[in-house]
A protein has these predicted regions:
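Hydrolase active-site cap/lid region
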Residues: 177, 181-228, 280, 290
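Gly/Ser-rich "nucleophile elbow"/oxyanion-hole loop immediately N-terminal to the catalytic nucleophile
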Residues: 131-174
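Acidic catalytic loop of the alpha/beta-hydrolase fold
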Residues: 255-260, 287
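Cap/lid segment of the alpha/beta-hydrolase catalytic domain
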Residues: 91-148, 205-212
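Active-site glycine-rich loops that stabilize anionic/oxyanionic intermediates
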Residues: 62-63, 82, 87-93, 255
Length: 360
């Protein structure tokens, strides 16, 4: 009898272990690729500044894609290997979206790597079909392709003698944050990802986002929306973000975001494991100017803590005592503010360019 009870208990516990923590999809079937496929990188020196030098890179990815990318290295060579941050742009932008921050990050001792997502930048098709909207299979496949492209980017970075393969971070904004939740979820080589203004749950996004390409498709054809939800479920980041744990993840979101709605933000946060940090600023999809430096402070502190082991100040108010004087602070602000402002202006222009009605 005890043996039967023991067997029953074992089966019960086994059944419990297959509950919500069990992955809904097999990551290798969705985001797997041939790891021995040659990268065949092509590298061309590009621009240089006083702080950094840029190398144009293309490399082979899955499905015979060649991925255009930029490797940004500090101008002055360093003896130690560098931590590298992969930068992923938002919808409608390209690999130069974070360019205004390249100088500050390379001066802080980081290498950077940025790619064009599928159907963006150098990979943008001439017919300009919207990334999201009436073609859910196309959108799904593009997101999967971009995640694989990012995994191949890590493969490439691990071949570079300047890069520390154990200190690869990630910053993704908006669509780049959604992609990053999947990428970091299926690739353990990514440390401490930062997901900016990202969200999950495609149903919330399609029904409540102010992006016209989703809203109009949902309103004009409810059956089409249901089909889109079925197709896109495999690339819903809520299924993948929990796999980031036990690596830490930072979320930064606006409490009045109507592009990636707050309900969608919280769905992604709730699906993530621990440790995680959630930072809210007061504003929409683009932080208001009053919070720009605070957001940058959070990002900088997170990178320095988890990739360099030396935390810095949390926000712009915390820089004042560290800099030692008001004059030193204003000098720092004069250098930092233009780059920060330029970045968020470009981000805002990209976002609101997609808010206007467009042909589906």
């Amino acid at each position: 009898m005890s043996a039967i009870l023991g067997l029953a208990l074992g089966l019960l516990l086994s059944g419990c272990s297959q509950s919500p923590s069990t992955p809904k999809y097999d990551p290798d079937l969705i985001f797997g690729y041939d790891k021995t496929l040659p990268l065949s990188p092509q590298e061309t020196p590009a621009e240089e500044t006083a702080d950094y030098r840029v190398i144009k890179v293309t490399y082979r990815s899955a499905r015979d894609q060649r991925v255009p990318a930029l490797l940004i290295l500090p101008k002055q060579p360093r003896e130690e290997k560098l931590p590298c941050v992969i930068l992923m742009h938002g919808l409608g932008s390209d690999k130069r979206m974070f360019q205004m921050l390249w100088g500050a990050l390379t001066k802080a001792g980081y290498a950077l790597f940025a790619i064009d997502a599928q159907y963006h930048g150098e990979r943008k098709p001439s017919d300009d079909i919207p990334f999201f909207g009436m073609y859910p299979y196309r959108a799904r496949d593009a997101l999967i392709q971009t995640v694989i492209d990012l995994r191949r980017a890590v493969d490439y970075l691990q071949t570079r003698k300047e890069i520390d393969p154990d200190r690869i971070g990630y910053i993704g904004a908006s669509m780049g944050g959604i992609i990053g939740a999947m990428f970091a979820g299926v690739d353990e080589r990514v440390k401490a990802p930062i997901l900016l203004v990202a969200g999950g749950d495609w149903k919330i996004l399609m029904e409540k986002s102010t992006l016209s390409m989703w809203r109009d498709a949902a309103r004009n054809n409810p059956q089409q929306m249901q089909e889109a939800l079925r197709v896109m479920d495999v690339v819903d980041p809520v299924h993948w973000v929990g796999r980031i744990a036990p690596r830490p993840v930072l979320f930064i979101n606006g409490d009045a975001d109507d592009v990636v709605p707050v309900e969608s933000n919280k769905a992604l946060h709730n699906a993530a494991g621990e440790p995680k940090k959630v930072v809210w600023y007061k504003g929409g999809h683009v932080p208001p100017p009053t919070d720009w430096l605070t957001v940058v402070g959070e990002v900088t502190n997170w990178l320095n803590t988890h990739l360099q082991g030396k935390p810095t100040a949390r926000g712009w108010r915390d820089y004042l005592p560290r800099l030692g004087s008001w004059r030193a602070f204003t000098e720092w602000l004069a250098l930092a503010a233009p780059a920060v402002a330029a970045f968020f202006r470009e981000f805002a222009a990209t976002v609101y360019g997609y808010l206007s009605p467009r042909t589906q």
